[in-house]
């Protein structure tokens, strides 16, 4: 299911910025924390967006898309631990997204992230701190509850939407132009 992967750790400063942002914005301690619905007011994204932009550009180059497409990407943060809920199975595809990704900023030894197939079988890819993986946005995936006490599982995730694709005189434009 994974179409691209690398390992890139966050700088100590950027990771500290993420922790501070999570600690000051995580209100319901029983629910996993996400900035998916409200990331505009968090200053940490001023530094996360360029960090992930470099990784995504490398990925798009390796996948052969950097030179034949224009794209947008999104970024959000999430945190869960043994006291919070997990992230139930879901997919990111709404008709626009092509590639989804997750960066495991801090993860336990337990593999929590999984893909789920049509028979409800779970497949757990390798997931170590610093790993960045990408997959087709239509793939159903989820996160099991963290079992390790006093451990915050922290990730950044996002989607890539192709705004324009040009190859062999085929030009596709999305409604996002």
Where are these regions (language model features)?
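Aromatic-acidic/polar surface patches that form glycan- and anion
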Residues: 45-48, 94, 149
């Amino acid at each position: 299911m994974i179409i691209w992967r690398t390992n890139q750790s966050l700088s100590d400063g950027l990771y500290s910025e993420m922790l501070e942002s999570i600690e000051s914005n995580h209100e319901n301690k029983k629910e996993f924390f996400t900035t998916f619905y409200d990331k505009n007011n968090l200053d940490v994204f001023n530094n996360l967006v360029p960090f992930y932009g470099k990784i995504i550009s490398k990925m798009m180059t390796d996948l052969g898309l950097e030179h034949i497409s224009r794209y947008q990407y999104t970024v959000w943060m999430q945190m869960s631990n043994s006291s919070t809920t997990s992230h139930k199975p879901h997919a990111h595809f709404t008709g626009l997204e092509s590639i989804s990704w997750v960066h495991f900023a801090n993860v336990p030894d337990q593999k929590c992230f999984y893909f789920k197939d049509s028979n409800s079988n779970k497949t757990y890819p390798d997931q170590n701190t610093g790993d960045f993986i990408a997959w087709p946005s239509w793939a159903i995936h989820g996160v099991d509850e963290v079992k390790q006490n006093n451990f915050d599982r922290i990730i950044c995730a996002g989607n890539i939407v192709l705004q324009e694709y040009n190859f062999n005189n085929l030009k596709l434009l999305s409604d996002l132009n």
